[in-house]
């Protein structure tokens, strides 16, 4: 069932398709997402330290882990690009906790509007800039680090090289990229007849982690770390399902019963997929390959990430 519910599309990644698909999925309304995601307003896998960790705490822990992998804790004022920034949660965390200067880009009008409101409400306007912009339109800018959380699923294998090349071109020496994405299991595959492709992610394509690491290295990155958070996404989705059930009447009033049931099925089946290892999710850390002297600027161990 998971294979039927969660599939991939062969025609993804173009600007026009991306804009239409992102609007279809994310412009369902900020209030609906608030009911499902909770006050964290973060639509990606969280990181649960233990069974007592709340969803809000787990999302903050995920953001902190990414900040540390990117080295944002090493010095204040580093420039971060958050690709597919959603409602601004990662950007706000990096600015608030580490003094990072953040540019967040999204092609969802609803997300950009709400992200800007949240940034202003948090008093982070001097550090965080939210743009309604495609990441491919950032040529000429330079960043110390890039986070891409839950956006890679919209790229597609055919445009993966373009994606990594663009991001590499935006990084300076020793620049780091953290790619956080759901991975297919058993090779990248296409299924345009899947439930998720038809009703939830009309441009979604999951890529095998092996293809992802090969793609990164082929475009000038040195892959330094790969971590699976599979069990954590199962837990995250169970929290979202519980939130939707708790606020069912309000959700139906916002989006209609059919849409609410589609989301309930999609999230429940996804949770089962992660629980049964039919799906996976990986954080892949790459640095711009240094061909001059091989120095990386990386810590010797993962100890300071935890």
Model-derived regions, located:
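Conserved beta-strand signature within the Rossmann-like core of class I S-adenosyl-L-methionine
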Residues: 174-182
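A short acidic, Gly/Pro-enriched loop at the edge of an enzyme's catalytic core
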Residues: 136-146
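Substrate-binding/catalytic lobe of Class I Rossmann-like enzymes that use SAM or dcSAM, i.e.
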Residues: 182-294, 300-305
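Conserved SAM-binding loop of SAM-dependent methyltransferases across substrates and taxa
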Residues: 87-98
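Conserved SAM-binding loop
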Residues: 115-116
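N-terminal auxiliary segments of SAM/dcSAM-dependent transferases
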Residues: 1-36
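Conserved class I S-adenosyl-L-methionine
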Residues: 76-84
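A short glycine-rich, Lys/Arg-flanked "PGG" loop and its adjoining helix->strand segment in the class I
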Residues: 161-174
